[in-house]
Structure formats: structure tokens, C-alpha cells
Amino acid sequence: MNRNAEVVTSAITSLDIHDIARASRTYGVRGVFIVHPIPEQRKFAASIIDHWRFDFGRAHDSRRREALEQVQIVESLDDAIAEATRIAGSRPLLVHTSARTATGASYAELRARMEAPGAPPTMILLGTGFGMAAEIAERADILLAPVLGPGDYNHLSVRSAAGIILDRLRGK
């Protein structure tokens, strides 16, 4: 969404791809899905990933390649859910994140749920711009409490939020 709560798309950035992939690999995430409906944006993201997986970057930095190998570019949330289900063998628990102050599950609650025997895989939905469209958020099974600092400023980049959330849910 944009600042006027209109549904829009935002551009994929190289930094978001790299940093989210690296944080995900660090915290043992088995897959990262970048969802974007615009073909040119998916092509852009794929070119970045392919550079590190198959081109010059493959030999140049094997650790970055390792992180980017788990990233998939898909057109829709349905595509991401279907692929995650295929990989894990069961539908993932969809976790909506938002910077807006709302009552949501605590990180301790979600972590316990994720670590419970027989727990389904978890898919954390992160948005850019001014948040996710309502139709995406409504599909989530659970709302996670926002990442909050000590002050009133709360507008993290998606890659910063991803790193913090992963540390709270998967960190030692």
C-alpha cells in the first residue's frame, strides 16, 4: 500500500534480496519467496539472483551464492504457498507482520508454536512501502506483534524488520 492506503506495488531492491537471503540463511530458514505481480520486477530480481548463482558471482562469493540459492521469485502469494507446501509436505502457517500497533501474538508465543512437535512450517509475510494490502493480511493465520523500538519512530526497512524478526524467532 502507499501512504494513502491505496493498493500499489513497490519496487524490489537488490539490497532487500541480498540482506533477507543472508539473514534467512543465517537463521536456518529453508526458503525465501519474493512475491511480485509485475513481470519486469520478477525478471529484475531473477537477474540479481542468477548473477550470484550462475554467473560471475558464483565463483566470486560462494557464501552469497549459498544464501541466494534458497530464494524463489513468484507472481503471487498463492504460488508461494503452493511451492512451500510442496517443499515441506504441509501448508505453512501464514504469519502477517505489520509496523502498525496492533494486538498480535508475541514473539515468544509464535516461537513456541513453531518449535512444538508436529508444527507446520511457518511463512512470515513481510511487506514494503506502507504495508500489505488488506486482502493479503486477511489470509494470514496469525498476526505477529510489531517490531517496536523505545521511541515513537517506527518505519524500518523490510530487510531490517526481517533480520529482527528472524533473530527473535530463531536466534539463540
Show which residues each predicted segment covers:
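Secondary-structure boundary/capping motif
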Residues: 41-44, 105, 132, 153-154
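Short, glycine/charged-enriched secondary-structure capping and boundary segments
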Residues: 47-49, 108-112, 138-141, 159
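Long, charge-patterned amphipathic alpha-helical coiled-coil/hairpin "stalk" segments used as oligomerization
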Residues: 95-136, 146
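RNA substrate-binding interface of SAM-dependent RNA methyltransferases
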Residues: 1-99, 163-171
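Short, exposed beta-strand "edge-strand" segments with a Pro/Gly-rich flavor and a Y/T-containing core
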Residues: 69-75, 100-105, 150-156
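Structured adenosyl-cofactor binding patch, chiefly the S-adenosyl-L-methionine
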Residues: 130-172
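Conserved acidic residues
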Residues: 30, 92, 121-122, 141
